[in-house]
């Protein structure tokens, strides 16, 4: 079956001297992996540069449902980046988000709303001119909505401790260890009220920001099966001092 779809690059693994295994989140079919042969010369369309983290591409291929690795027939850039490849901060964020999405969408089928959210977020990051230190935090919070486990911050009126397991506030300390103290809980409430346009208004120290990311990643681990440690988090910890 011939398929034409837009797709977002999540992960690229070198396979031999002239092939790549590329994981995509596609608009029409959800998560797919491809074996891509790249030329050693400058000729040909399948250039390695196309398959960088979060690149938004147009794909054309013959879909084989029983195959674990699809084969591309044609590829082109749908959204050319103007700033992400040239900004160390945006590049660091894009690597972090690509790794996050690579784990979070492993079993994801076609999901138009999720795909549109990710694509719009990538475009926003590329065009952003102001402070972006909170971008990945806002992204992770909003992404949790699409996976069905967005925390209930409205329950904050009835308790001081945010329960990471139940995704809501508790009046008393939960019986398990996965909860936040009052200070972290109130910061979480503030962050959940932000969007990309207002995120620059909320200032945090490097330590506070890293703590927020740690908390949200713990929340993901509790609600997404087999969610691993994020290797790229170490890069972000150093970027926004």
Residue ranges and their predicted role:
Residues 1-241:
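Non-catalytic alpha-helical scaffolds and adjoining flexible linkers that form interface surfaces
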């Amino acid at each position: 079956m011939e398929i034409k779809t837009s797709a977002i690059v999540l992960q690229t693994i070198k396979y031999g001297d002239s092939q790549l295994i590329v994981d995509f989140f596609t608009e029409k079919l959800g998560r797919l992996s491809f074996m891509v042969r790249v030329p050693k010369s400058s000729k040909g369309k399948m250039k390695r540069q196309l398959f960088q983290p979060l690149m938004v591409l147009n794909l054309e291929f013959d879909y084989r449902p029983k195959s674990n690795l699809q084969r591309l027939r044609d590829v082109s850039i749908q959204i050319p980046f103007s700033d992400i490849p040239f900004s160390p901060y945006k590049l660091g964020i894009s690597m972090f988000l690509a790794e996050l999405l690579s784990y979070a969408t492993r079993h994801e089928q076609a999901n138009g709303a999720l795909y549109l959210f990710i694509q719009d977020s990538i475009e926003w990051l590329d065009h952003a001119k102001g402070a972006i230190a909170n971008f990945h935090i806002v992204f992770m919070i909003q992404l949790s909505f699409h996976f069905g486990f967005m925390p209930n911050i409205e329950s904050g009126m009835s308790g001081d401790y945010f329960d990471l397991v139940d995704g809501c506030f508790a009046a008393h300390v939960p019986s398990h260890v996965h909860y936040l103290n009052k200070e972290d809980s109130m910061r979480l409430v503030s962050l959940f009220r932000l969007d990309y346009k207002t995120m620059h208004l909320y200032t945090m120290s490097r330590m506070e920001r890293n703590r927020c990311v740690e908390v949200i990643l713990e929340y993901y681990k509790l609600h997404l099966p087999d969610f691993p440690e994020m290797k790229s988090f170490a890069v972000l910890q150093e970027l926004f001092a």
